[in-house]
Amino acid sequence: MELKVTTLEGKEAGSVQLSDAIFGLEPRADIIQRCVQWQLNKRQAGTHKAKGRAEIWRTGKKMYKQKGTGGARHGSARVPQFRGGGRAFGPVVRSHATDLPKKVRALALKHALSAKAKDGDLVVLENATLEAAKTKALIGHFSGLGLTNALIIDGAELHNGFAAAARNIPNLDVLPIQGINVYDILRRQKLVLTKAAIDALEARFK
């Protein structure tokens, strides 16, 4: 697969040959969905907590005598049916993380990249550098390229000026190649890869 390379100014800078083993697969929604669910499960805090009947600070004395009241039998005021009682089967602090094999994660990333390439939502930049860290100038460059909702992936090191200028632009994320992931690829309309990012991806999956 061959794609043209553009600069931030919108000029053509040649073309790049993309590996079909990474960008030319037929996307499978089931594999992508498994990886997205794995990511969302892993990042969930799991700090929810409700007190059970054993954790309620209340007297343990029997409420009233067993017989002769005409009412139902009760032994504790901490039970869930009373106001202020403990929660029955309430949430507890736990990890929501699930397991997903590394090979499936790698395959899901390839399918997400292939999906963007197939839909025509993959853009290749020569580099992601900016002389002056000016957000207004960067917005102008992105408008010229038609990028209003995009994820930009650079090489191992982000250019400080570019990253600082992009920080305040809504619907735009900038990540180094180490941070590339299926969820962020799918949540943005366009995927922008620099030539350094493509080289790193091909080296990773070689």
From Swiss-Prot:
Pfam families: Ribosomal_L4. Keywords: Ribonucleoprotein, Ribosomal protein, RNA-binding, rRNA-binding. GO terms for biological process: translation. Belongs to the universal ribosomal protein uL4 family. Part of the 50S ribosomal subunit. One of the primary rRNA binding proteins, this protein initially binds near the 5'-end of the 23S rRNA. It is important during the early stages of 50S assembly. It makes multiple contacts with different domains of the 23S rRNA in the assembled 50S subunit and ribosome. Forms part of the polypeptide exit tunnel. The keyword rRNA-binding applies. One of its GO terms (cellular component) is ribosome. This is Large ribosomal subunit protein uL4. InterPro entries: Ribosomal_uL4, Ribosomal_uL4-like, Ribosomal_uL4_dom_sf. The keyword Protease does not apply. One of its GO terms (molecular function) is structural constituent of ribosome.
